């Protein structure tokens, strides 16, 4: 026949590991959402600062910002 059945004896359930036991508490709050805005404003500030940082790096890379005392070849 073209099909073959697999015995269910190979399915022994999830295997417990030391790493899994250590990481289990981190997943205990899965699916729960804190009421209100939470840390959203903090994340917005972090994203804005990161965008400013990236724009400064881009301007330095493009030599559009002149830095005194630093020679650019």
From Swiss-Prot:
Q: Where is this protein localized, as stated in its record?
A: Plastid, Chloroplast thylakoid membrane
Q: Which residues carry this modification: Phosphothreonine?
A: 3, 5
What keywords are assigned to this protein? Chloroplast, Membrane, Phosphoprotein, Photosynthesis, Photosystem II, Plastid, Thylakoid, Transmembrane, Transmembrane helix
Please classify the protein's predominant subcellular localization into one broad category. Answer: plastid
Q: How is it modified after translation?
A: Phosphorylation is a light-dependent reaction catalyzed by a membrane-bound kinase; phosphorylation occurs on Thr residue(s) in the N-terminus of the protein.
Pfam families under this entry? PsbH (PF00737)
Please name the GO terms that the record assigns under molecular function.
phosphate ion binding
Locate the transmembrane regions by residue number.
41-61
InterPro entries from the entry? PSII_PsbH, PSII_PsbH_sf
Keyword DNA damage (UniProt): no
Q: Look up and give the membrane topology term.
A: Single-pass membrane protein
Question: Which biological processes are named by the entry's GO terms?
Answer: photosynthesis; protein stabilization
CC terms in the record's Gene Ontology section:
chloroplast thylakoid membrane; photosystem II
Q: What does the function comment of this entry state?
A: One of the components of the core complex of photosystem II (PSII), required for its stability and/or assembly. PSII is a light-driven water:plastoquinone oxidoreductase that uses light energy to abstract electrons from H(2)O, generating O(2) and a proton gradient subsequently used for ATP formation. It consists of a core antenna complex that captures photons, and an electron transfer chain that converts photonic excitation into a charge separation.
- Report quaternary structure and partners: PSII is composed of 1 copy each of membrane proteins PsbA, PsbB, PsbC, PsbD, PsbE, PsbF, PsbH, PsbI, PsbJ, PsbK, PsbL, PsbM, PsbT, PsbX, PsbY, PsbZ, Psb30/Ycf12, at least 3 peripheral proteins of the oxygen-evolving complex and a large number of cofactors. It forms dimeric complexes.
Matches recorded under HAMAP family: PSII_PsbH
| Identification of the protein by name | Photosystem II reaction center protein H
Taxonomic source organism: Piper cenocladum (Ant piper)
Gene responsible for this protein: psbH
């Amino acid at each position: 026949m073209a099909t073959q059945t697999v015995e269910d004896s190979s399915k022994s359930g999830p295997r417990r590991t030391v790493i899994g036991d250590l990481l289990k508490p981190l997943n205990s709050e899965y699916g729960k959402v804190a009421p209100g805005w939470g840390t959203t404003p903090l994340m917005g500030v972090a994203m804005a600062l990161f965008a400013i940082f990236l724009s400064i790096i881009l301007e330095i890379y493009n030599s559009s910002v002149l830095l005194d005392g630093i020679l650019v070849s």
